[in-house]
């Protein structure tokens, strides 16, 4: 081999080695949470079940502390500057509604519940299932996921209740929708059909959800839907 070829070959070898080392020492950080990872993770599913409650109305705060009864003849709210009086004086309209965006908020909650019900079956618990020392943890997590599904069904029923008491019959949608879903295929269901759906979902939830006095982990389940909530609705 000619002498001048040796430095060239050595240089090429060093380039390959240093390039490979650079990949090992400076790996690309994976910052994207994929849909698949989110669906199989128990902790992410827990977080998503909690997120379903974020569409509930904010108690008495979204109407300046007034109850909805003050929008009718049932009650009178004494704070004269409160937004609730917009109903009484007739100053509210589609762009200025003291009740907020009830249509958007409740349908977002319904769509989130539909997606949760579909994807909560994909949680990967095999690492517990096949570990003889983790059988109790495995069963507890299965039970939790099962309960969260019925919480989601109750919340979906509640969001439909919030819609029908304002708008009457609305489309009953129980499957997840994507960006390419054709919304024109959905029509308005009758009020009686909506009420039957709400009652059926609440009956199913009440048969599974626990009463507050029978909860075993009250601290971590405070504020979640219960048997009493489903029966009350």
Could you tell me what each predicted segment is?
Residues 1-30:
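Bacterial Sec-dependent N-terminal signal peptides
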Residues 21-69:
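Membrane-proximal, proline-rich intrinsically disordered regions
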Residues 23, 61, 163-172:
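Proline-centered turn/helix-capping motifs that create local helix->coil transitions or kinks
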Residues 46, 54, 81-167, 183, ...:
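Conserved, well-structured interaction surfaces
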Residues 173-181:
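Short, conserved phosphate-binding/catalytic loop or strand-edge motifs used
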